[in-house]
Amino acid sequence: MRLSSICSLIDGEKKEGQQLCLDAKFLRGKSAGEYQQRGKFVHKGDNIILVDGENSGEVFTVPCDGYMGSTFKQLWVSSIMHLPYVLNYILFYKELLRKSKRGAAIPHLNKEIFYSLIIGIPPYQEQMRIVNRINEIYSKIK
């Protein structure tokens, strides 16, 4: 099944009122963050994906409510999927997504490639087992 059948990149809810701007520098811990008066609101725990720039395809889990930086889209994943399974899948293809950007001046995530990636969809319990195994292996190589 193609990734497009279980997830999509959405803009987020337009809102007004002072909120923290969740840009890449803030999310990487390299800035204290700035506030802005309007933007595309996301909630703590949402996942957002970098769609513009050098690191297109990088996914972040939102640490607090705020406005997405302008280089992000919100990553919506179907409830039939175990979210960590999909996030690990996207992480597996991170280099492909970074190297297949579109645009000359400011490279953008190639959404055609993103949405056309083929993902196996095992039963939900198997998705959970796979993620647990990935986590076990990852903890041993850290």
Model-derived features: positions:
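Conserved catalytic alpha/beta cores of large enzymes that bind or transform nucleotide phosphates
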Residues: 85-93, 103-105, 118
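Short amphipathic alpha-helical signal-transduction/dimerization elements
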Residues: 91-98, 138
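Short alpha-helix capping/helix-loop boundary micro-motifs
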Residues: 31-37
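Generic recognition of stable, solvent-exposed alpha-helical segments in well-folded globular domains
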Residues: 1, 37, 43-44, 81-88, ...
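A short glycine-rich beta-alpha junction/loop motif
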Residues: 66-73, 103-124
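Non-catalytic DNA-recognition/assembly elements of restriction-modification systems
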Residues: 1-14, 21-28, 116, 120-142
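A short beta-sheet element
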Residues: 38-91
